[in-house]
From Swiss-Prot:
Protein's name in the database: Muramidase-released protein
Organism for this UniProt entry: Streptococcus suis
Residues that make up the propeptide removed upon maturation: 1227-1256
Lineage: Bacteria, Bacillati, Bacillota, Bacilli, Lactobacillales
Cell compartment(s), UniProt: Secreted, Cell wall
Membrane topology: Peptidoglycan-anchor
Motif LPXTG sorting signal positions after renumbering to this chain: 1223-1227
């Protein structure tokens, strides 16, 4: 089942109420303008339903096999249905038109500024004028450039607007009666933010030569119609105070959809209206849903840009109705609109209305030559009907005529942009809107060529692949009507007429694989509601296919389907769209211009100002405005100031009346009398201050600035400085002479240029010259000083030549002499001097002053000890420096203090001599009493500056003697002092004697005589063969020393692979050493080794035997209580050991039975002993192979007997049913079997030990 659709597209339905925004309009804003939105007023009806509507309708048949028509949702409008404005190939020209507009304002603003500068000095205003003129020059260059791009033009538009705004802001300071003295002649209304409320006006008199009656402060009839309403029944303006209704929407298509079978709702008898308030600085919109019947406001919201609100009243009318959402869409904002209001429900956009801008509607009063006399601006909302300010009387002018002109709409004339597209099955076309006048537009329809196979632009204005179908007549809003409809009947594309259906037939497609094709058709479909047949056009397609159920081919369209004629879908399907060709855009405002001509009964006097080159330097001023002929004037009194300041800031002084000037005094004549004055540029004198190299040491100063030519100046009197401090240094004027900077004259000023760092060589006195900026330069040199360092001893004697630390340094420079302060000085004669810091004279650190600073370092002469070493020439004798302490220069020298080398001074040791104190020949003390070779402690010098000789005296010869206790010499005497030593036959007693002469005697005693002996052990066989090397058991030892050779007595010895065993000992194994050698001989016999036997052992995991050892190699076997682990070990002798583990214990019981096996007592768990049972006597105990115990009893006879005394018997093996021997189980931890096992293990070990003993 296919659906049949009818949808509404209003190609003119988007209201456009913008205008150019002064200072804020350019080509860029054109590109950002908002196009109309498709789907405005979309509706859904049944396929066979005819809707009488002023809205456009799209009819589309898409049902291939069924006659049932199904209502469909209204078409959704999205970003793909809208398009930004696209410019044509003339976009550069359009942009230049905007640039011409904004540049036309620049001269007017600059002229006003010049007039103010002629009366007062204002540097800020002068700078703003200069900037505006600079930007104007650059803009004119772009206007003249035939190859300029849109981007370049737009950049100039922006630059000029910024400059003009800045200049306009400066001019606000200069007003007359609170009004600016000029207004701009612009083509478009001013949408610049204003403080005026909607309906308020403001007048400006531009021509200062005239007066206006009524005053420009009066509205003079200027007014607005506050609301912009359609002439539809029931639609009224808002009643909210200070709000103005600018548009409404009648909910027509929304209601048709809600009442359709799709929604099953109901129509809402209301309309929505939108209003702006009277504050032009705001953009909030009041949205009101209003009852058509009562006029009551059903629901309302104030919407800020970017917000959305929801109206819920429709659901109160019928629950199936959709809520209405109104979105203030700022994505559509531009310089001429804050955005658009989108009316939607369920994402279907039914209406899009652009919010108008606030704008100034200007009435102009101009002359026939185009000169603007005055303007009156009225604050409006774009689209409001304006009553202009009426004709006024201007002195000296006569009214001629009135003209009106529509204000530019949202886009400038020539703008082209995509209005919308239709892509329904085989119906494929686009609509492009072109602005042909400020208040007029046309629609151009292009259908897609059915044979075109290339790329298609559905989002822009590129018509490649399209064929132009028609262009509508220019449509606009006419006061008193609702819509303006198309009246153009011309079809652009080639077509033929199908007389059977009275439709125009256009191009057809190629056949597809099924033999089907389609062709484009159209039909004028307007009526009285569209003001004629050409107010609506039906654009559709027919398909070439077969009639359903037959092979009959033919052309079929949507109307056939609706008439019940069914046909096959062979790849193409027909569709159709009704297009209402109307303009729903109200006209933009109209501005009025009154034209005047000059009256011959009046005249005026203006004054112009020129420089000496004949160039006008400031704008003309009006001396006498339009006045009756014969009125007296005198410009010398009123309009000849002593000086003027040009727009570029140049100062001029009056010089004379220009040769072609009118008289400066007289009476007014018809027309304009022009008086011309000549002014000459002011002159200046600047003073510079540099050093001899040309470096600036003080900022230049102005001695005379913008002074009148001919005026005397004297910089020596006013600016010459004797000294200057710069960067902490003092500078003074230099005398006349040549310097790097150049030649300096007697006035201390530069008169010839040197190194080109300074070039001001004008004289220091003279006269101001017109247009000349004189430069005087004074030359300075830094004031200098020197620092000298002297070196003297404590007596004031010079010990070293003076040194210059700094020479000719600028005063104030830092200096330090510490780098020229040696701690020691050695003079040419070899004398040593040590610095005494406390006696330094002068400041070591400081700043240079003019003159010479002297710093004197004082040194102490430091002498030496001179050791007079015997046999050494006097010139070669060493010198031992005094350890002088410069921090304590007045303290005696301490000879034990380390010197400058860090060592304590000492007098050298000379063998055979002793150094003595020269004062009293007292021997000096050795530094180390035990080692005089380390030197001697020097004596304390009496004068640190005088050498102290150290004499050496010979010392007496000493000897060393070695004697026994009786004093007899036992070794030769030795010279010097020698230590004791080893002497054969003697030992040192520890006594040494030294006499007063230093002779040493060591005392010894005789060593006692000792007899020694040794003990040797031999190893031989019975026949005396040595089978082992002899061993010294006891080396040489004193007689009587105990010895024992058993530690050297092996039981066996292996010799040449055969084993020998000890059989006897010859000699004494234990005893005492005697003089000489004691011999002990061990005698051995060869061992005959029998063949080894192997055995098999059975042990548990701990190595304990669990069965008797067996000779030979036996396999593992079953052992009660144990199980084989699977492990068998064979040692190096071939013995085998099987390893077992204990079998887990099972639960056992104890039974008590008679000899027939009958129980005579209860069975007991575990192994329990026999017990006394009445009437029975114990016989024996049997333990089965499971470990269960059975005690057997014999029944007693009635005959009493005397019990026999039991005799303990050795345990015997009980008999079991199987006849196997069974060990009794006593229930104890160590059973008999365990004891037997232990005994067997002990026996085995004993046997093993005995075997090894035998082997030994």
């Amino acid at each position: 089942m296919r659906r049949s659709n009818k949808k509404s597209f209003d190609w003119y339905g988007t209201k456009q109420q913008f205008s150019i925004r002064k200072y804020h309009f350019g080509a860029a804003s054109v590109l950002l303008g908002v196009s109309l939105v498709l789907g405005a007023g979309a509706q859904v009806v049944k396929a066979d339903e005819t809707v009488a509507s002023s809205e456009p309708t799209i009819a589309s048949s898409v049902a291939p096999a069924s006659t049932e028509a199904v209502a469909e949702e209204a078409e959704k409008t999205n970003a793909e249905n809208t398009s930004a404005v696209a410019t044509t190939s003339t976009e550069v020209e359009k942009a230049k038109a905007v640039l011409e507009q904004v540049t036309s304002e620049s001269p007017l603003l600059a002229g006003l500024g010049q007039k103010e500068l002629a009366k007062t000095e204002d540097a800020t205003l002068a700078k703003a004028i200069e900037d505006a003129q600079t930007k104007l020059a650059a803009a004119k260059a772009i206007l003249a450039d035939s190859e300029a791009t849109v981007e370049q033009v737009e950049a100039q538009v922006a630059a000029v607007k910024v400059a003009n705004e800045a200049l306009g802001n400066e001019l606000q300071k200069y007003t007359v009666d609170g009004l600016l003295t000029a207004a701009l002649d612009t083509v478009a209304p001013d949408t610049t933010a204003s403080t005026l409320k909607v309906g308020d006006g403001e007048g400006t008199l531009l021509d200062s030569t005239t007066t206006a009656t009524p005053s420009m402060a009066e509205p003079n009839g200027a007014a607005i119609a506050p609301h912009t309403l359609r002439t539809q029944d029931g639609i009224k303006a808002t009643s909210e105070p200070n709000w103005y209704t600018f548009e409404s929407y009648d909910l027509y298509s929304y209601n048709k959809n809600m009442a359709s079978s799709t929604y099953k709702g109901a129509e809402v008898d209301a309309y929505i209206r939108y209003s702006l308030d009277n504050d032009s600085s705001t953009t909030a919109v009041l949205a009101e849903l209003v009852s058509r019947t009562t006029g009551d406001v059903l629901e309302k919201y104030t919407i800020e840009p970017g917000e959305s609100v929801t109206f819920s009243h429709p659901t109160k009318v019928n629950a199936n109705n959709s809520n209405i959402t109104v979105t203030y869409d700022t994505s559509l904002a531009s310089a001429n609109t804050p955005g658009a209001l989108k009316f939607s429900a369920n994402d279907d956009v039914y209406s899009t209305i652009i919010v108008p801008a606030y704008q100034i509607n200007t009435t102009r009063y101009v002359t026939e030559s185009g000169k603007v006399l005055a303007t009156y601006g009225l604050q409006t909302i774009a689209g409001q009907v304006v009553t202009p300010s009426s004709v006024r009387v201007f002195t000296g002018y006569d009214y001629v005529a009135t003209t009106t002109k529509a204000v530019q709409g949202p886009y400038p004339k020539g703008t082209v942009y995509l209005a919308g597209t239709v892509q329904k099955d085989t119906v494929q076309y686009k609509v492009i809107r072109e602005i042909v006048e400020n208040d007029q537009a046309v629609l151009k329809f292009y259908y897609l060529d059915p044979t075109y196979k290339g790329e298609v632009d559905w989002r822009g204005t590129d018509t490649t692949g399209f064929i132009e179908l028609l262009t509508t007549s220019p449509t606009t809003y006419k006061v008193g009507t609702i819509y303006d409809y198309n009246i153009n009947s011309k079809i652009t594309a080639p077509f033929t007429i199908d007389p059977t259906k009275n439709v125009m037939v256009f191009k057809e497609s190629e056949q597809n694989e099924q033999g089907s094709k389609y062709r484009v058709i159209a039909q004028w479909s307007g009526d009285e509601t569209t003001k004629g047949i050409y107010g609506k056009i039906y654009i559709a397609t027919q398909v070439w296919t077969t009639k359903l159920g037959t092979n009959e081919w033919g052309w079929f369209d949507y109307s056939d389907d609706q008439a019940g004629i069914k046909f096959n879908n062979k790849g193409f399907w027909p569709a159709g769209v009704q297009n209402t060709l109307r303009n729903a855009t109200p006209a933009t405002a109209v501005e009025t211009t009154y034209i005047y001509k000059e009256s011959s009964k009046y005249g005026d006097v203006i004054v112009e100002y020129y420089d000496t080159d004949g160039k006008q330097i400031v704008n003309s001023v009006v001396d006498t405005p339009k006045s009756a002929l014969g009125t007296e004037y005198n410009t010398d009194v009123d309009r000849r100031p002593a000086s003027l300041v040009a727009a570029d800031g140049t100062v001029y002084f009056y010089k004379e009346v220009k040769s072609d000037s009118a008289k400066t005094t007289g009476t007014v004549v018809a027309g304009t009398t022009t008086v011309k004055y000549v002014y000459e540029k002011a002159g200046s004198v600047n003073v510079n201050f540099v050093d001899i190299n040309g470096k600036v040491i003080k900022a230049p100063v102005s001695d005379e600035k913008d002074a009148k030519p001919g005026y005397n100046y004297d910089t020596d009197l006013d600016q010459k400085l004797a000294s200057i401090t710069f960067e902490g240094k003092e500078y003074k004027l230099v005398p006349a002479g040549d310097y790097p900077v150049g030649k300096v004259g007697k006035g201390n000023n530069l008169i010839e240029v040197g190194n080109n760092t300074a070039k001001g060589i004008d004289p220091t006195t003279g006269k101001i010259e017109a247009g000349v900026n004189k430069e005087v330069t004074y030359v300075y040199r830094a004031v200098t000083g020197s620092v000298v360092v002297n070196y003297k001893d404590t007596e004031g004697n010079v010990i070293k030549d003076p040194e210059t630390d700094v020479s000719d340094a600028p005063v104030g420079d830092a200096y330090t002499t510490t780098d020229k302060k040696p701690n020691e000085i050695i003079t040419k004669d070899g004398s040593r001097y040590v610095l005494v810091p406390s006696k330094t004279d002068g400041e070591e650190n400081g700043k240079v002053i003019e003159g010479t600073i002297t710093v004197t370092y004082v040194y102490q002469k430091v002498a030496n000890w001179i050791p007079e070493i015997p046999n050494v020439p006097e010139t070669d004798r060493p010198k031992v420096p005094y350890p002088f302490d410069p921090t304590e220069p007045d303290e005696p020298i301490d000879p034990t203090t380390p010197g400058t080398n860090g060592e304590v001074p000492n007098i050298p040791y000379v063998p055979g001599y002793t150094p003595v104190d020269p004062k009293d020949n007292t021997p000096l003390k050795p530094i180390d009493p035990n080692d005089p070779g380390k030197g001697y402690v020097p004596p304390t010098p009496e004068n640190p500056g005088v050498d102290t000789p150290i004499p050496y005296v010979p010392v007496k010869k000493v000897v060393t003697n070695h004697v026994d206790e009786e004093g007899n010499p036992i070794a030769p005497q030795e010279e010097g002092t020698k230590p004791n030593k080893s002497i054969p036959g003697y030992e040192f007693t520890g006594k040494t004697v030294t006499d007063e002469d230093g002779n040493t005697t060591h005392i010894y005693k005789k060593t006692p005589e000792v007899k020694n002996g040794t003990v040797v052990v031999n190893y031989v066989t019975e026949d005396g063969t040595v089978i082992k090397e002899p061993v010294t058991d006891t080396p040489t030892s004193p007689e009587g020393t105990p010895y024992d050779t058993t530690d050297n007595k092996p039981k066996t010895i292996t010799f040449k692979g055969e084993e020998y065993e000890l059989v006897r000992v010859d000699g004494t194994e234990n005893g005492k050493v005697v003089e000489g050698e004691t011999v002990v001989t061990y005698v051995y016999r060869k061992v005959e080794t029998p063949a080894k036997k192997v055995v098999t052992n059975h042990v548990d995991e701990e190595g304990n035997p669990v069965a008797p050892q067996e000779e030979g190699t036996k396999p593992n076997k079953s052992i009660p209580g144990y199980e084989f682990t699977g492990k068998t070990v064979t040692d190096e002798d071939g013995n085998t050991t099987h390893i077992y583990k204990k079998t887990p214990a099972k639960k056992v019981v104890t039974n008590h039975v008679d000899e027939e096996g009958n129980p005579i007592a209860p069975q007991e768990d575990g192994t329990t002993p026999k017990r006394q049972i009445s009437g029975y006597e114990y016989v024996r105990t049997v333990v089965d192979e499971e470990g269960n115990t059975t005690h057997i009893y014999r029944k007693l006879s009635n005959k009493p007997t005397t019990p026999e005394k039991e005799t303990p018997a050795k345990p015997q093996a009980g008999k079991t049913a199987s006849g196997k021997a069974q060990l009794p189980n006593t229930g104890e931890a160590s059973s008999v079997a365990g004891a037997l096992g232990t005994a067997m293990l002990v026996a085995t070990l004993a046997f093993a030990r005995k075997r090894r003993r035998n082997e030994d």
